[in-house]
């Protein structure tokens, strides 16, 4: 009778040694992001973090997100060094719009077969994103799950917690007719609309690795990491106290994201002619024959963040943002919505 061979976890497709090697590789990344409130290092069962000093009535704000199918493009291009920045950006930009300062971040990395080099690149990007946002990378989960993912394909999720003073929560309730809308530029499509983007590339049969737009490779424009707006916006809030609402322009574009922070009866009137749309969006529209309204419903079209302030604070707000290295502009204003009108009106839409 044949003796059954002794099976190990590695035989089943899970390499514990690889997981431990990854942890060693990323300890220094986490250390660089450490805030004074964080207690202990990586490797514990749970991460501990004190509330920063100076808050009277601190309110915790949490968020979770992924990077959508931009990840598929990253895998296809074998480019893993900035997708972690995207992951952090998608979470922290959602927190800062209510006035919150991000405190700590955790990530979830799931794969069929762990490639330590790839995972280390991803986590290094996450660390870079945390540094840009001023939050600590306090832990995460690396799950090697054979049979769940194809080969070394992986998926990502991020989780972030921030804090805001209860009396200073920004919720859009003070937005009023006549207020101004300011915009901050995006770096490209950020992390939204990539299912449409990939479909356009497929239908057009475009060799994106050999196309240049404005002197830059198209792949670079499509993979440009999502901008992290935390530090300029926190500076704006602290120095002016004038911010009434902010909208992170993600999936759904201007049309779906601005209404999330508008009170009933308010309408945002946005002048599409107030900025030059980056070439990557024009290329996508042309190659996919995408209708103008659909462009603004799916993609950010060059606008990453919209900020509402009273008219008398416009100049001060623009100055503070410029001091912080931003290139803001006035994109529109708040009006009283007519009966049955949409909450966002796009003016000067170009004919398609």
Curated annotation (Swiss-Prot):
The gene is purM. The keyword Cytoplasm applies. SUPFAM superfamilies: PurM C-terminal domain-like, PurM N-terminal domain-like. It is found in: Cytoplasm. GO terms for cellular component: cytosol. This is Phosphoribosylformylglycinamidine cyclo-ligase. It comes from Pseudomonas syringae pv. tomato (strain ATCC BAA-871 / DC3000). InterPro entries: PurM-like_C_dom, PurM-like_C_sf, PurM-like_N, PurM-like_N_sf, PurM_cligase. HAMAP family: AIRS. Its EC number is 6.3.3.1. Pathway: Purine metabolism; IMP biosynthesis via de novo pathway; 5-amino-1-(5-phospho-D-ribosyl)imidazole from N(2)-formyl-N(1)-(5-phospho-D-ribosyl)glycinamide: step 2/2. Gene3D superfamilies: PurM-like C-terminal domain (3.90.650.10), PurM-like, N-terminal domain (3.30.1330.10).
């Amino acid at each position: 009778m044949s003796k059954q061979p002794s099976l190990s976890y590695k035989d089943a497709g899970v390499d514990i040694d690889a997981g431990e090697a990854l942890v060693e590789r990323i300890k220094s990344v986490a250390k660089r992001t450490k805030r004074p409130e964080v207690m202990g290092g990586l490797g514990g069962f749970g991460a501990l973090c004190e509330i920063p000093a100076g808050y009277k009535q601190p309110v915790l704000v949490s968020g979770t997100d992924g990077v959508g199918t931009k990840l598929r493009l990253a895998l296809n291009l074998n480019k893993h060094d900035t997708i972690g920045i995207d992951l952090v950006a998608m979470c922290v930009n959602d927190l800062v719009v209510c006035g919150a300062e991000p405190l700590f971040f955790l990530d979830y990395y799931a794969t069929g077969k762990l490639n330590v080099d790839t995972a280390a690149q991803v986590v290094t990007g996450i660390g870079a994103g945390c540094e840009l946002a001023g939050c600590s990378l306090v832990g995460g989960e690396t799950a090697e799950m054979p049979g769940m993912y194809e080969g070394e394909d992986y998926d990502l999720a991020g989780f972030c917690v921030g804090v805001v003073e209860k009396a200073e929560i920004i919720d859009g309730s003070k937005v009023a007719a006549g207020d101004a809308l300011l915009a901050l530029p995006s770096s490209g499509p950020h992390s939204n609309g990539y299912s449409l983007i990939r479909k356009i590339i497929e239908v057009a049969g475009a060799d994106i690795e050999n196309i240049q737009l404005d002197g830059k490779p198209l792949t670079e424009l499509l993979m440009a990491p999502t901008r992290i707006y935390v530090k300029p916006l926190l500076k704006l809030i602290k120095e002016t106290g004038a911010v009434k609402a902010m909208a992170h322009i993600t999936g759904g574009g201007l049309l779906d994201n601005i209404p999330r922070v508008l009170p009933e009866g308010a309408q945002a009137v946005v002048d599409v002619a107030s900025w030059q749309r980056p070439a990557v969006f024009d290329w996508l529209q042309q190659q996919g024959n995408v209708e103008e309204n659909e462009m603004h419903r799916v993609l950010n079209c060059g606008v990453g963040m919209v900020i509402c302030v009273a008219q008398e604070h416009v100049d001060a707000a623009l100055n503070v943002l410029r001091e912080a290295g931003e290139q803001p502009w006035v994109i529109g204003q708040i009006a009283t919505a007519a009966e049955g009108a949409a909450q966002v009106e796009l003016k000067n839409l170009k004919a398609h």
